[in-house]
């Protein structure tokens, strides 16, 4: 399995970037995981870049209105989507205005991290942490805080 986190916007905040890098490193002990930052812009520009970043993958659009999943169901979903096709699962996070409608419509599934609205950079950290948690759950390992 390979995971891709494609997100609109750059993370410039050093502590936030450090936390993301910590969890990405932990995920990579289990599976390959790429993070792709896409420059923010109008939907006509962002949409094709997100599509290219997720080409050939099972695509999960991360949206407030998506399916709300607990950590166990999230892990099971990662495993299910990761076992299909090429074994690549791409998680897409939009910018301040969310994902372009055509990108959302083309996704294989839509998940939500919470009914709360998060700044997109914080949502990325929460997603990456949940991907690490999913890896530990799938292997029956205790979660390392």
From Swiss-Prot:
One of its GO terms (cellular component) is cytoplasm. InterPro entries: Alpha/beta_knot_MTases (IPR029028), RlmH-like (IPR003742), tRNA_m1G_MTases_N (IPR029026). Keywords: Cytoplasm, Methyltransferase, rRNA processing, S-adenosyl-L-methionine, Transferase. It catalyses: pseudouridine(1915) in 23S rRNA + S-adenosyl-L-methionine = N(3)-methylpseudouridine(1915) in 23S rRNA + S-adenosyl-L-homocysteine + H(+). Homodimer. It comes from Sorangium cellulosum (strain So ce56) (Polyangium cellulosum (strain So ce56)). The keyword rRNA processing applies. It is found in: Cytoplasm. This is Ribosomal RNA large subunit methyltransferase H. Gene3D superfamilies: 3.40.1280.10. The keyword DNA-binding does not apply. GO terms for molecular function: rRNA (pseudouridine-N3-)-methyltransferase activity. It is an enzyme of class 2 (transferase). Specifically methylates the pseudouridine at position 1915 (m3Psi1915) in 23S rRNA. S-adenosyl-L-methionine binds at residues 94, 113-118. PANTHER family: METHYLTRANSFERASE (PTHR33603), RIBOSOMAL RNA LARGE SUBUNIT METHYLTRANSFERASE H (PTHR33603:SF1).
């Amino acid at each position: 399995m390979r995971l891709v986190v494609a997100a609109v916007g750059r993370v410039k905040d050093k502590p936030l970037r450090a936390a993301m890098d910590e969890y990405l490193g932990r995920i990579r002990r289990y599976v390959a995981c790429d993070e792709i930052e896409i420059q923010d812009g109008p939907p006509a520009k962002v949409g094709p870049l997100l599509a290219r970043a997720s080409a050939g993958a099972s695509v999960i659009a991360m949206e407030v209105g998506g399916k709300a999943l607990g950590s166990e169901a999230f892990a099971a979903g990662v495993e299910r989507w990761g076992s299909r096709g090429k074994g690549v699962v791409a998680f897409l996070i939009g910018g301040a205005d969310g994902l372009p409608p055509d990108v959302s419509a083309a996704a294989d599934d839509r998940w939500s991290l919470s009914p709360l609205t998060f700044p997109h950079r914080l949502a990325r950290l929460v997603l990456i942490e949940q991907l690490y948690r999913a890896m530990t759950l799938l292997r029956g390992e205790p979660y390392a805080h």
